[in-house]
Amino acid sequence: KTIKAVGFDEPTLTWMAEMDLVEDSAYQGALVIVCDTANTARIDDKRYSQGDFLIKIDHHPNDDVYGDLSWVDTSSSSASEMITLFAQTTQLALSDRAAELLFAGIVGDTGRFLYPSTTARTLRLAAYLREHNFDFAALTRKMDTMSYKIAKLQGYIYDHLEVDENGAARVILSQEILKRFNVTDAETAAIVGAPGRIDSVSLWGIFVEQADGHYRVRLRSKIHPIN
């Protein structure tokens, strides 16, 4: 069988993996698996419905039910945790490279095991992946590394963060600010956890202005899950 990864590249993660270019003909008779995508509007490649069978694997609330088969588990920290559980339970042969990427997915979605979604099962499955042969230290060090311009943007966020008496915080990143720091919307994902390092902050939102004037909102919480 032939397996292709379809979708848009995330610029900050291309060091880890890049998407494949897929012709329309590849969808003929294909099994399409959509991961970590709660609603159809967020699916990168709109050809997802052109295959023979569609599976949804996700850990967000199942508000948009789609697919011929849907596996949604809101108790999981991530789609990576779910896939790891499936591989372990069914005793699939898991390559070292696959284990590395799944481990990175769990680390990323749990904020390095800091978020409330981290369970005992999450840690057991991460340990199972860690038993595979990949450079754990290099991977996690790379995931924790930021460019100088992102570091400067993080400083701006700390300087301009508004925090109320309930521990709710917000900061607005306008197009002007993005241009000043030479940062794209996608690159702001690297600083989404920054406000959470402040002891008086319980939940926070980062409002990123888009080129068309709309805002992308990144919401996070230390205690209560946000979906």
Locate each region found by the language model:
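Structural motif
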Residues: A30-I33, F53-I55, L203
